[in-house]
Regions:
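Short glycine/serine/threonine-biased micro-segments
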Residues: 2, 154-155, 162, 212-214
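C-terminal extensions of enzymes
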Residues: 188, 194-244
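Structural signal for hydrophobic packing residues in well-ordered secondary-structure cores
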Residues: 47, 172-176, 211
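Electropositive phosphate-/nucleotide-binding environments in soluble metabolic enzymes
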Residues: 9, 13, 37, 85-88, ...
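Short loop or secondary-structure boundary microenvironments that flank
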Residues: 5, 33, 58, 129-132, ...
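Shared catalytic-loop signature of beta/alpha-barrel
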Residues: 75, 86-103, 108-206
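Active-site donor-binding loop signature of nucleotide-sugar glycosyltransferases
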Residues: 81, 183, 212
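Metal-dependent enolase-superfamily TIM-barrel catalytic cores that perform enediolate-based chemistry
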Residues: 1-98
Length: 244
């Protein structure tokens, strides 16, 4: 589960405790310069065994390499997208300077990006978000490349409703997706969702993959209509929304 930047470390620790009680076992924390070392130190002191990763969202530059190296002390699963998303080359310069595995997210939009990143040694892990790369055609290409070349891979989401979430879950269940994925329970973002049944976190920190026909969930058209009506009434711009 992902946790954004909070007011202080104590607030972050409280949220982590809540998420762990809800069943999540892998914690991702957003970081930025000045909100990183102290945060990692505090989390490790409070939760020494938790599976922990940090997501920088391109907040650093290569000049911060010595600073980022300090994060090696906190047994991180990975650091995600530390440098600008459009600079795979700079990531290839950073990865040899730190022990923590770099994971590329926004940098990977095509299989060619993935191939270049691995060839240059810019990362050891790829976060594959089907919506980010244009859908499942390109996702499958990236997935196959990672599996064939032994690249660690996990599946992320982009605030999908149950329609997209069910497809992402099916994709995340493929062999070769080797790391915990960033797919949360339905009520983390939508309550209610436009589909039934909802996705829930099980005691072992997993979500059941849909097994019903089609995408595995049923679209609730009354909720879709409510969402469309809300958008028409409240968004400050008009959307080309078809009648449903």
């Amino acid at each position: 589960v992902s946790i954004g930047i909070q007011d202080d470390v104590a607030s972050t620790l409280a949220i982590i405790e809540k998420r762990l009680q809800q069943g999540y076992q892998r914690i991702k924390l957003k970081i930025k310069p000045g909100w990183d070392i102290e945060l990692a130190q505090g989390v490790r002191a409070a939760f020494p065994e938790v599976m922990l990763m940090l997501d920088a969202n391109s907040a650093y530059t290569l000049h911060d390499s010595e600073y980022l190296r300090q994060l090696d002390d906190y047994d991180l699963l990975m650091i995600e997208q530390p440098l600008p998303y459009n600079d795979i080359y700079q990531h290839s310069k950073l990865q040899p300077q730190i022990e923590t595995a770099i994971c590329l997210d926004e940098s990977i939009t095509t299989v060619d990006d993935a191939m270049l990143a691995i060839e240059l040694g810019a990362c050891r892990i790829i976060n594959l978000k089907p919506a980010r790369v244009g859908g499942f055609t390109e996702s499958i290409k990236i997935y196959r490349f990672c599996v064939e070349n032994g690249v660690a891979l996990w599946i992320g989401g982009m605030l999908e409703t149950g329609i997209g979430r069910s497809a992402n879950l099916a994709f995340a269940s493929l062999p070769g997706v080797t790391l915990p994925c960033d797919l949360s329970a339905t009520d983390r973002y939508y309550d209610p969702d436009v589909t039934e049944p909802p996705f829930v976190i099980r005691p072992d920190s997993t979500i059941a993959t849909p097994t019903e026909n089609g995408i595995g969930v049923m679209v609730q058209m009354d909720r879709v209509q409510q969402a469309v009506q809300y958008c028409r009434e409240h968004l400050p711009y008009s959307l080309p929304i078809a009648n449903v």
